[in-house]
Amino acid sequence: MDDKSMARGRKAFVTGFPIKHSRSPLIHGFWLKELGIDGSYEAVEVKPEDFSSFAASLAANGFAGGNVTIPHKEAAYAAAESLDEAACAIGAVNTLWLENGRLCGGNTDAYGFAANLDASAPGWDKADRALVLGAGGASRAVVHALLSRGVCHVSVVNRTLSRAEELAAHFGARVYAHGWDEAQALVSNAGLIVNTTALGMSGHGEGQDFPIDLTCAPKEAVATNIVYVPLRTAFLNKAEKAGLKTVDGLGMLLHQAVPGFERWFGQRPQVTQALREHILADMAKAGAL
């Protein structure tokens, strides 16, 4: 039996609360059509108080698995009977699948972050030092990716220092916590600068100047944002003006979807320019560029 026959009729999902904004159905729908797989992928809105029962009934509802987004990633971590290494390190699950009747959980955010940089800025992981702006949930996946790829020194800057200290303590050696007032001084020797903050996102000071001068960064440094709405944030615009290589966050969204699709439908999809343009067209239609 070939992969397409095995995947025939398989169902997968993305769940969150709210979920109508998700572009995951567009991504997976594109791949299902491109690969000629007779499967489906749908958005399912689940309230936080209903998540446990939803996760327990995946098989009964005919799902092979699915993606999990805000606010359910920690609940999915707790619900999974088996976790992959990334989920254990990050403490959150964004991908669920069934294996021999067991609910398994993984986290593909770190993979997506690194794969996006591999595609758009090859050699980024030669940087000895990285600067991560922000210490929220998303920064955990970024730090895990950086450590996994051998970055020697990761500085995490956050307005609330205790959040950065908590993250540094979680990952241990090679991760250092700093207050926001130290960010400027850390730019000068950072080979990679990652913005995980909401600064510059839609509804979070969009259009305002980014509050850090990036002109003193090493000329070979790479600057990347993990958000993709808007595509070109104030941070990326400022980095570009400073002459740095910039990588937007859309590729992370696309690449993090790859492992889950392969688990549910049996074929590994490719992140292509055609897929990127498909999502950009939808963003343009929604006024999200």
UniProtKB/Swiss-Prot annotation:
Organism this protein belongs to: Brucella suis biovar 1 (strain 1330)
Residues forming the catalytic site: K73 (proton acceptor)
Annotated protein name in UniProt: Shikimate dehydrogenase (NADP(+))
Pathway the protein contributes to: Metabolic intermediate biosynthesis; chorismate biosynthesis; chorismate from D-erythrose 4-phosphate and phosphoenolpyruvate: step 4/7
SUPFAM superfamilies the record matches: Aminoacid dehydrogenase-like, N-terminal domain (SSF53223), NAD(P)-binding Rossmann-fold domains (SSF51735)
Gene3D superfamilies from the UniProt entry: Leucine Dehydrogenase, chain A, domain 1 (3.40.50.10860), NAD(P)-binding Rossmann-like Domain (3.40.50.720)
Pfam families: SDH_C, Shikimate_DH, Shikimate_dh_N
Binding residues annotated for NADP(+), in chain numbering: E85, G134, A135, G136, G137, A138, N158, R159, T160, L161, S162, R163, I226, G249
Catalytic activity entry: shikimate + NADP(+) = 3-dehydroshikimate + NADPH + H(+)
UniProt KW Electron transport keyword: no
Cellular compartments per GO CC: cytosol
